Each structure stands twice: as structure tokens, then as C-alpha cells.
């Protein structure tokens, strides 16, 4: 996209700050953890929402520690305070925070708005249609993006330049490049990884990532996918929240074939469909056999450990039932035997 490249060219004049991003991974039938995508369109994705997982984990440990009058104090390993301190620190001494948002549904704003306000910051939200006429109001504050790519690309050069100069979180490179699922294809290209990783690091990354193919790349694999839908999954390269994601085993033959006929596949990436491990879980007394999608919470060059996991009876979460899981890091058998997973 020419417009996108123009914005990225101007952004390249500024040192890269990744902002917040959330790599997601699946668990294969063999137990391998495999990265499937990175969510980084919106600031704070997972950073704040995982607070609820910390609370649930704390309650769980307190409950089993007080059973039978044992009074055991099971420690909770959590990076909650560390990650909240970091997202407060990056605002610096700016007292005003401006959130620029699209119509996309997100629960994060409802969490980080009161968080920053509790620390004496004033938080104001501008809908996408109000962003351009309020440049003079937001450009001197700490600017947070909750804008999707379509809205960002609709803004004038003056508006995107103001976002760059304001040091908007997230950086356009994070929004347009890291969030784009085509980025994962580069992890398997020596010409790319040789510039930033050692051979050992590249091999490790590839062993924990799902191979990702671009349209027009490896025609043999794309043709195999067209014939054998159950072995593959198609994903729109830009969208999130499982929008325009077609898992072969869950997609009827006509819908699958139609994506080739009308050219939709040209805007998609292709991945092998990973057969995932199922976990027996109990939710409000009902037994489920769930797939698990894990997440990694990251900000700039820092990794803040696991956030809130998602569980679903379908191999693609967000397209059907969607439940939440709180991770607890422990090697204590007294805790492990009480956990669902």
C-alpha cells in the first residue's frame, strides 16, 4: 500500500519504540508452543485486561491455602505491578493523555482510563471522526492509539505527522508491520533473520512459530491448500479478533473454493492447520474439552510474562464460545493437582 509506505517512511526518521504488543500461541497435540500471530494494533492490548487473571489466580491460591484449616500461604508470581509501573512510566511528566479511537470494540480503554486518572493524569478520548479537527488539543499530550488501519490511512499527512511528532503509542511500524500477519513469513527467511538474529536464535524462533505463506509464494503449498482445506487455515493479513479467519476443518467446501475464485486469498496468509491439544475444564459445573490460546505480554523491549489465556471448544477462539483462563506459575504439586489444566 503506497499510502502506508509513505507514513512508514516518515516514521522511520524517529527511533523505533515498539509500544505494547501481544504474541499469541497455540499448544499442539505434542505439547509444542507455537506462535500463531501478534496483536499490536491498539495500545495496551492484554496489559490491563490480564489484571482479572491475576485476581482470579490470587483468589484460587488463597482458597486452596485455607482448605482444611491448613493456613498455607501459596505465593503468587505476578508481573502486574511491574507492567503497570512501566506503562505509567512511559507517559513521563505529561499530565494529559489523549486516546484516539476507532469504532472497534475494546475493553482496554475502560481500564487504562481510570488507571491513569488515579495517578493524576487527565484522560480525554477522541473518536476517529474528531481526531483531525482537534490536532491542536492532543498533539502536545501523551497520545495513545486505539485506531484501526483503515482510519489511520484516511487521515491527512499533517495528522499522521502530528502523531509521529507526539510519539504516539503505538508506533506506526508496530501497527502496520508487526500486527500484519505477513511479518511472520519473514521469520522463515534467512535474508531477514540474518540481519537481526544468530542462526541459533532463528532456529529457536522457527521451532516455536507456525510457518506462514504469502499469496504468490510457494504455489505448490497454496494449490495443496485449495485441494485439501482441512490441512490449512486462511487469515486476512491485517484484521484482528478472528475476523476473516477461515480454518479449513470449520469451513465448508463452497466457501473455501469461493475465496480462490473471487480473489479473496490475495489478501490472506496461509498457515498449516495445527492439531491442538485439548484440555478438560470445568466451568460453573459443566465439563468442557477446550483448546487453549496463550499470550505473551510485551512493551517496547520488555517481556512481562503470561497474560490471561483464552479457552474455547473450537480450535479458533473468538468465533464461538470464548472462556478465560488464569495462568499460575508453579512447580508445587499441591497446586498443580487442583488446577483444571
Q: Language-model segments: which ranges?
A:
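Low-complexity, highly charged intrinsically disordered N-terminal segments
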Residues: 1-7
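Structured beta-strand/loop patches that form or line metal/cofactor-binding pockets in enzymes
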Residues: 9-19, 277-283
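Short, solvent-exposed loop/edge-beta patches enriched in aromatic
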Residues: 16, 27-33
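Short solvent-exposed loop/turn micro-motifs enriched in small/polar/acidic residues
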Residues: 17-20, 289-291
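Residue-level marker for buried hydrophobic side chains located in beta-strands
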Residues: 21, 32-34, 232
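Hydrophobic residue at the +6 position relative to the catalytic HRD Asp in the kinase catalytic loop
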Residues: 23-25
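Domain-scale recognition of functional cores that engage charged ligands
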Residues: 28-30, 42-48, 53-341
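Activation of the activation-loop gatekeeper triad in protein kinase-fold domains
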Residues: 38-39
Amino acid at each position: 500500500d503506497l499510502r502506508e509506505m509513505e507514513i512508514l517512511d516518515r516514521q522511520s526518521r524517529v527511533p523505533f519504540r515498539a509500544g505494547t504488543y501481544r504474541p499469541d500461541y497455540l499448544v499442539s497435540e505434542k505439547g509444542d508452543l507455537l506462535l500463531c500471530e501478534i496483536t499490536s494494533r491498539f495500545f495496551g492490548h492484554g496489559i490491563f485486561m490480564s489484571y482479572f487473571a491475576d485476581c482470579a489466580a490470587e483468589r484460587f491460591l488463597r482458597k486452596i491455602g485455607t482448605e482444611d484449616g491448613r493456613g498455607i500461604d501459596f505465593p503468587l508470581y505476578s508481573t502486574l505491578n511491574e507492567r503497570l509501573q512501566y506503562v505509567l512510566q512511559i507517559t513521563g511528566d505529561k499530565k494529559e493523555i489523549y486516546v484516539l479511537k476507532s469504532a472497534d470494540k475494546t475493553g482496554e480503554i475502560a481500564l487504562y482510563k481510570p488507571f491513569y486518572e488515579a495517578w493524576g493524569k487527565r484522560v480525554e478520548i477522541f473518536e476517529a471522526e474528531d481526531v483531525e479537527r482537534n490536532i491542536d488539543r492532543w498533539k502536545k499530550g501523551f497520545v495513545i492509539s486505539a485506531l484501526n488501519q483503515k482510519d489511520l490511512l484516511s487521515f491527512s499527512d499533517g495528522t499522521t505527522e502530528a502523531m509521529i511528532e507526539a510519539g504516539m503509542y503505538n508506533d506506526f511500524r508496530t501497527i502496520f508491520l508487526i500486527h500484519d500477519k505477513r511479518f511472520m513469513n519473514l521469520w522463515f527467511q534467512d535474508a531477514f533473520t540474518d540481519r537481526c538474529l544468530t542462526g541459533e536464535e532463528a532456529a529457536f524462533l522457527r521451532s516455536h512459530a507456525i510457518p506462514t505463506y504469502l499469496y504468490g509464494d510457494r504455489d505448490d503449498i497454496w494449490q495443496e491448500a485449495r485441494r485439501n482445506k482441512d490441512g490449512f487455515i486462511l487469515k486476512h493479513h491485517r484484521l484482528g479478533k478472528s475476523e476473516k479467519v477461515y480454518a479449513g476443518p470449520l469451513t465448508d467446501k463452497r466457501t473455501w473454493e469461493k475465496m480462490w475464485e473471487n480473489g479473496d486469498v490475495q489478501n490472506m496468509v496461509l498457515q498449516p492447520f495445527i492439531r491442538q491439544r485439548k484440555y478438560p475444564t470445568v466451568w460453573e459445573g459443566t465439563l468442557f474439552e477446550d483448546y487453549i490460546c496463550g499470550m505473551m505480554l510485551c512493551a517496547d523491549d520488555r517481556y512481562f510474562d503470561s497474560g490471561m489465556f483464552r479457552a474455547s471448544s473450537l480450535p479458533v477462539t473468538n468465533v464461538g464460545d470464548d472462556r478465560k483462563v488464569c495462568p499460575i506459575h508453579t512447580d508445587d504439586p499441591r497446586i498443580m493437582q487442583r488446577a483444571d489444566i
